[in-house]
């Protein structure tokens, strides 16, 4: 239950003569903080210890762009909300386009983005209409068993990103390779 809260409490559990302490996660980043984290000088290359070996997982993500952090799906089998939180923090359009432009300049880029998504691709820019309601909420999922009436499910910001990326010089096609979740009221 604590992992579903915006501001969780520390959990203490006695085990024998010791106490296990689980500290609460940091609050979600701001968009500016997230953008700055993506502005760091990443090489987009595997660790040097692989010395030219093929890494199948790297092939899959080499030309991918992460649009946001977090997932409000609350799927029982998944740990994204435990690692990134259930509250979506999205990168700015400018930050995303800057990264895509950098990818188009990579020597082996052929014009195809393998994934323009995130933990759950279509949750970009979605959040509660009234944050104070979200801060009190303990539900593990904002979409199951029913979509929360406080959830903004507007896909237009995401569609704008898709159209803007596809219009860039050097982009032939972009794909959505990460999970798409149903966030509609139907």
Question: What label would you give each PLM region?
Answer:
Residues 82, 127-141, 149:
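Short secondary-structure boundary/capping segments
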Residues 1-61:
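Flexible, acidic/Gly-rich N-terminal and inter-domain linker regions that tether
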Residues 82-112, 163-164, 168:
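Conserved alpha-helical substructure of the radical SAM core
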Residues 185-186:
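Conserved small/polar residues in nucleotide/adenosyl-binding loops
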Residues 51-79, 112:
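N-terminal pre-triad scaffold of radical SAM enzymes
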Residues 93-100, 141-163:
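Phosphate/diphosphate-binding loops
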């Amino acid at each position: 239950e604590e992992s579903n809260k915006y501001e969780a409490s520390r959990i203490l559990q006695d085990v024998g003569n010791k106490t296990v302490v689980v500290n609460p996660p940091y609050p979600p980043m701001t968009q500016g903080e997230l953008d700055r984290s993506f502005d760091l000088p990443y090489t987009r290359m595997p660790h040097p210890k692989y010395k030219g070996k093929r890494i199948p997982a790297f092939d899959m993500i080499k030309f991918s762009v992460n649009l946001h952090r977090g997932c409000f799906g609350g799927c029982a089998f998944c740990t994204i909300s435990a690692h990134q939180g259930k509250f979506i923090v999205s990168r700015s359009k400018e930050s995303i386009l800057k990264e895509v432009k950098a990818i188009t300049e990579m020597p082996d880029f052929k014009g195809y983005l393998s994934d323009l998504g995130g933990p759950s691709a279509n949750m970009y820019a979605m959040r509660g209409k009234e944050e104070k309601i979200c801060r009190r909420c303990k539900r593990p999922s904002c979409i199951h068993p029913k979509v929360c009436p406080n959830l903004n499910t507007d896909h237009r910001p995401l569609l704008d990103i898709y159209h803007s990326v596809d219009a860039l010089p050097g982009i032939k096609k972009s794909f959505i390779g990460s999970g798409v979740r149903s966030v509609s009221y139907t």
